[in-house]
Regions:
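PLD/PLD-like phosphodiesterase catalytic module centered on the HKD motif
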Residues: 1-307
Length: 307
């Protein structure tokens, strides 16, 4: 039986019931991504999920992933990055999430992720974008296990350097991936940890024709109604029974949980973006208490109703 959720109800189910198995068998460590979660929200008849160290098997019981990291503990630093490639007969989605990849490379990235959608174009020779993608993965010792040349990487949206926090420079690794100075057609959803209340997401994402929907403010403060509002589901400090973070100054605080949706009018697409960032040493969680960072970019899915 299909379930329908509001945005708020969905996030509560994901966060609070995931461990109980009510919706998903939700277990994740620093190195593993749950395939069931991806299958649930990226549903497509010909969906394939290629993950770094898949935790659960696919729907057929067979693990499918195209890359793996050679050295998880390079020079004493845990490998924290999640690279996920999702392919269907129509598009390829390359999702990158970085948090302290090693002790020596872009360790100040905080909690950025990038969702890149690439249309399928049939078999073609490698172009500049496939070359950069391979260079990017090679830079992080990601060993490819299949070919990506059948996707039209030339049509990739190139504007990825968006709202990087002042004093943090991790753009060099992305310049290998694509030329950010050239405007091309395509789609990309970019989320960085520096987005703050009151910022114009449409302008930041450089989306011309779209509407942006925001989650309701749990505190119901009327003065925040016109701002970009985030939900802080775990905002209550049990010791003091007070909120940990003040929403009015959230841009100066560690982001704990945020969610918003972006709806495109041309082409007709909709994204539900869920992320969390507890920037302490347990940001990525444990097997018993998983990190919420597994909810990356979720494509709009007619199977579910996120009204």
């Amino acid at each position: 039986m299909e379930k329908s959720f509001t945005c708020d109800a969905l996030s509560r189910e994901l966060i609070f019931n995931g461990l109980k198995g009510d919706i998903i068998d939700y277990v994740i460590s620093s190195y593993k991504v749950n395939v069931k979660l991806i299958y649930l929200y990226f549903y497509h008849p010909n969906l394939q999920v290629h993950c770094h160290e898949v935790l659960e098997g696919t729907s057929t019981g067979k693990e499918t992933f195209i890359y793996e990291h050679k050295d998880k503990f390079q020079k004493g630093g845990k490998y924290h990055a999640k690279f996920i490639l999702i392919t269907t007969t129509e598009v390829c989605r390359f999702i990158v999430m970085t948090t302290n990849i090693t002790n020596i490379t872009i360790q100040n990235c905080l909690n950025d992720y990038y969702v890149i959608t690439v249309p399928k174009c049939g078999l073609k020779a490698p172009n500049v974008f496939t070359t950069r993608l391979y260079q990017f993965l090679d830079a992080y010792s990601i060993r490819l296990k299949s070919c990506l040349n059948q996707y039209d990487w030339y049509g990739l949206e190139a504007n990825l350097l968006v709202s990087i926090p002042q004093g943090i420079n991790h753009s060099m690794c992305w310049r290998m991936l694509m030329n950010t100075n050239k405007k091309v057609q395509g789609s990309a959803v970019i989320r960085t940890s520096s987005l703050a209340l009151g910022w114009d997401i449409k302008k930041i994402l450089r989306i011309q024709q779209c509407t942006v929907e925001y989650a309701k403010d749990y505190t119901k403060r009327p003065e925040l109604q016109d701002l970009i509002l985030y939900n802080f589901d775990n905002n209550l400090d049990k010791k003091t029974n007070k909120n940990k973070y003040d929403l009015r100054s959230v841009e100066m605080k560690p982001f704990h949980y945020k969610r918003y949706t972006i709806e495109y009018t041309k082409p007709n697409k909709r994204w539900l973006i869920i992320t969390s960032a507890n920037l302490g040493k347990s940001a990525w969680g444990t097997l018993k208490w998983p990190s919420l960072n597994a909810e990356l970019g979720i494509t709009w899915n007619s199977k579910f109703n996120f009204n």
